Amino acid sequence: LSISDKIRVTLAQQRILPDREVNIMKGLSLIKRALQVKANIVILPEVFNTGFYRHNYESVEPLEDELSLLLKISEQKDIMIIAGVAEREGDDLYNSAVIIYRGEITGKYRKTHLFPLTDEKKYFKAGDRLEVFETPFGRIGILICYEVRFPELSRKLVKMGAEIIVIPAEFPKERIDHWRVLLQARAIENQVYV
């Protein structure tokens, strides 16, 4: 990315509810609002489809089915969607983030550091690698929520070529000041956009 490149990014703040279908429709509504302000990229929260409501986990469909409405809108409109999702693969469930562009899932990251205080490892399988994704808007690395607390993860993404680090999260509102400091620290330490 050069200093003259401009990218409009919309952070879709959404209250995650116990109803999976309502969450997906709300996410779609927020994407449509991002289109109104001519966003290039819209970022949905961590596990935006299910939240951490365990009763939702059993009904999670394969990604292409779970995210069919998002795939469709990204195909029709010129917008990249980065969404935190509960992803099912066989019997395993992952806390993942996907990059959707032009009707396709063009990148997928599975959370490697599961949050111990909420027993994520009891429900989700950990991912096994960091990745940087080449996109029309630059090289994007992804972490998910709790992983912002590990500076070495951001550093590794930058060493792998990341110019932007996206961190979908479901971070508690009560600690939002803490969240902002963590994001600023990762940006300053690595001299990249977070």
Segment roles from a protein language model:
Residues 22, 26, 58-65:
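Alpha-helix N-cap and loop-to-helix initiation/capping positions
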Residues 22-33, 148-155:
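Short, acidic/polar
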Residues 9, 31-61, 81-82, 147, ...:
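Active-site beta-strand/loop signature of hydrolases that rely on acidic residues for catalysis
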Residues 2-9, 132-141, 164:
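Beta-strand-turn-beta hairpins that frame and shape the catalytic cleft
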Residues 13-18:
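Short polar catalytic/cofactor-binding loops
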Residues 25-41, 67-80:
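A short, N-terminal amphipathic alpha-helix
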Residues 63-82, 149-194:
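CN hydrolase (nitrilase-like) catalytic-core segments centered on the catalytic cysteine
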Residues 88-160, 173-181, 185:
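Active-site catalytic loop in hydrolytic enzyme cores
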